[in-house]
Design a protein with these regions (language model features):
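Short, glycine-/aromatic-enriched active-site segment of Class I SAM-dependent methyltransferases
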Residues: 186-202
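Short alpha-helix
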Residues: 201-231
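Core SAM-dependent methyltransferase catalytic element
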Residues: 236-262
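A conserved beta-strand element that flanks and buttresses the S-adenosyl-L-methionine
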Residues: 149-150
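Conserved beta-strand signature within the Rossmann-like core of class I S-adenosyl-L-methionine
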Residues: 173-186
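Rossmann-like AdoMet
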Residues: 1-84, 88-130, 143
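Short amphipathic alpha-helix with an adjacent loop that forms part of the alpha/beta core around
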Residues: 136-144
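A short, conserved alpha-helix within the catalytic core of class I
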Residues: 157-169
Length: 262
């Protein structure tokens, strides 16, 4: 029996993104996400806006490709490490990855309530019902293992102070931490609107030019590297293998910025 889900604002965007992954997985196949397909199959929700929003779909798939690659590489280097997925929504990366010791999915109580119904988790996978800006570090049981923190699809809905607060929580909890943070260019924040996101009444509010600019705001972190989502786009739109080499296009695209605890 399918479930009817009602959300609004930023939490509603999680339905759009899991739908994009499910649709890609069952269609063209640039990613494979059977858990997303199962989740969408059990929902009553009008995805007509998401169906028409090609930009949103492409962006979700591109960042999934890049983040899966970076997460998998980190887990190979740190087997048994701890992963914290901040603002997890209905993300299913924990089902696509292996090699972690513990995986925490963190989001607002409203969101976690939905996740618990659709993706009940236990064992190595835990859920934390808190805001990303709350002091959630005390909910992490592991003491000395290296940690990977993923911040996907969130910073563009926050303020600079909010972003700094999240990194302060991370620095206060982990001595050894790598952060994968998705960011949006300020020009895009001001001028670009995704149809399905607008339909959920969520608004883009903050952006940062590049990894160096983000690191300058975070005294406890150093920049390791950054990746344009054009890298992910190139996996399913071949022309991006060329377009991604053009600085203006590479720089205007969302980025996955990799930072390390100092």
């Amino acid at each position: 029996m399918s479930e009817k889900i009602t959300l609004s604002g930023v939490p509603e965007t999680m339905l759009q993104t899991v739908y994009a992954r499910a649709k890609e997985s069952s269609g063209r196949g640039a990613i494979r996400d059977r858990k997303a397909e199962e989740t969408i199959g059990g929902l009553q929700y009008d995805f007509s806006l998401a169906d028409r929003d090609k930009a949103m779909h492409s962006g979700v798939i591109a960042r999934t490709i890049v983040l899966d690659r970076l997460t998998g590489a980190w887990l190979q280097e740190h087997p048994g490490g701890t992963v914290v997925n901040v603002a997890c929504g209905l993300d299913t990366r924990c089902y696509r990855m292996e090699g972690y010791g513990r995986w925490y999915n963190l989001d607002l109580p409203e969101t976690i309530a939905v996740r618990q119904r659709l993706l009940p988790e236990n064992g190595a996978i835990s859920q934390i019902a808190m805001s990303a800006m709350d002091d959630w570090g005390g909910c992490i049981a592991e003491q000395d293992t290296p940690a990977l923190v993923i911040i996907e699809g969130l910073t563009m809905y926050l303020t600079e102070t909010d972003v700094q607060r999240i990194f302060s929580v991370i620095a206060g909890r982990f001595q050894s931490a790598t952060v994968l943070a998705e960011t949006m260019n300020p020009m895009v924040v001001k001028r670009f609107r995704e149809k399905s996101i607008e339909g959920s009444h969520a608004k883009f509010t903050w952006g940062v030019k590049n990894g160096a600019a983000l690191a300058a705001l975070l005294p406890d972190f150093r920049l390791r590297e950054e990746h344009s989502l054009t890298e992910g786009m190139a996996e399913f739109v071949p022309v991006y293998k060329l377009l991604g080499k053009i600085p203006a296009i590479r720089n205007i695209s969302n980025k996955i910025i990799v930072l390390e605890r100092k």
